[in-house]
Amino acid sequence: MASGENQSSSDNQQRRWHHIRKLLERSGPFCHPDFEPSPEILDFIMDSCKVLIVGAGGLGCELLKDLALMGFKKLHVVDMDTIELSNLNRQFLFRKNDIGLSKAKCAVEFVNKRVPGCEAVAHHCPIQDLDEGFYRQFHIVVCGLDSIVARRWLNGMLMSLLQYNDDRSLDQSSVIPLVDGGTEGLPEHCIEYVKVIQWAKENPWGNNTALDGDDPQHVAWVFEKAQDRAVKHGISNVTYRLTQGVLKNIIPAVASTNAAIAACCATEVFKLASSCCANMNNYMVMNMADGVYTYTFNAEKRPDCVACSNSTRIVEIEPDATLQMIYDKLCEDPVFMMKSPGITTVINGRNKTLYMSSIKSIEERTRDNLKKKITDLGLYNGVDILVADVTTPNTITIKLKFLENQDVEMAR
């Protein structure tokens, strides 16, 4: 009897991977040039390939489910957040009893139980708390974050792990591909927030009245509140018709959009891990506002990119400018887009902190420097300033160039 059960289990496993094996064990016109069909590729995906999923929210739940069902067993999930009531309508791995618990831990526990053989591991912490050694162990990183700051930091971390040969060529073995997915600016989010959160708190008809998507007064109230929230967060296209559709579950756009984007990301992870098909080059947009529209294009790299360029970053500034002007430029300039930069320099061989907001005592001590002219602080044409920010794990060196001295060779 036991032998028969084992045979049945083995047969089920073979059938489970039957269609994936067709992709991995035979060639085709869209395969990567380095692809060699082999049954060992599936063994690598299942037993060796380590994938880090950053974020366990709407996208992260879908990614974890998709990758586990694709055969990836060595999955790690990192998320610092806990589960809230408003998450339950689109983050399907969570239940009402999970409210207040770790997203990463609950998601991993759910998938490990439902997908045989999955060995997912949860990390309930900020991504900044994990060191280089942690990130270096993964073959691929895929993220579903709603924070631009966190996405930029993660990109910077993976860039910092790159190694170079003696001839300054990139060591390809040090490259950890990043598949970056995101959904943002959806008007449905505003409606769902009012439906799940604000209705319970501000229901003008009393706590005993249930929200009715067929009641024009209820729909109008939700529509008005959703519009207010949309204006506050710079989101458009909240309409009465859309409000009614979301309330009656006719338009499950948030959940379906997350599922579609996660499926695209998971497919890219599979392609990177197996080389069974050329990977995307390199950016895809999906717009589901009016039907479904997708567009894939090659996003060009800036030659002076702050994250990956080896060129010296130069900031042009008036010599009578204040440190506040440099601070504002670092925050507002599209090249940098920093959040709270800390600025230091080296003067006469000694480190000097000009301004740093991340540490309260130093911020209080250096706050007055923001009002001072940069020349009064010892900065000169051609000087290097060192800038640290939450958007990058590394310090960035920037050379100041005084505008009135454009024809004068900068000091070295």
Whereabouts are the PLM-identified features?
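Adenine nucleotide-associated cytosolic modules
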Residues: 1-412
